[in-house]
Amino acid sequence: MIVGILTVDLSVPGSNSLKDKRQVIKSLLTLIRNKFNVSAAEIDHLDSHRRAELAFACVSNDQALVNKMLDKILDFIRSNPLCEVVDSDLQFV
């Protein structure tokens, strides 16, 4: 069994309040959960209105499949005009 964990550090430059940031992040997490069927959560910078750290987990018996899925998620996030990827990390367990 392969577990892939993707963490993504984001900047939300258009956000002027926590409410603005949460709207962007909640929408992004919902879209990703529905499109890719992965576990997703905001894990850090909860009280910052311009930063967010998200984590995604995918389980499979094929590491190539997990890697491909998490790469697609990262590309999807990068294509979102409301946030910018500052850093990302991919780990396999």
Q: Which sequence ranges carry the predicted segments?
A:
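Short, charge-patterned binding micro-sites
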Residues: 3, 41-62, 91
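Short glycine-/aliphatic-rich beta-strand segments at the starts of folded cytosolic domains
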Residues: 4-14, 18
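Beta-strand elements of well-folded, non-transmembrane domains
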Residues: 10-14, 34, 60
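A structural boundary/capping signal
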Residues: 11, 37, 73-75
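C-terminal binding/interaction regions
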Residues: 21
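Amphipathic alpha-helical assembly/interaction segments
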Residues: 31-33, 37-44, 67
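C-terminal structural segments of small proteins and small subunits
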Residues: 58-93
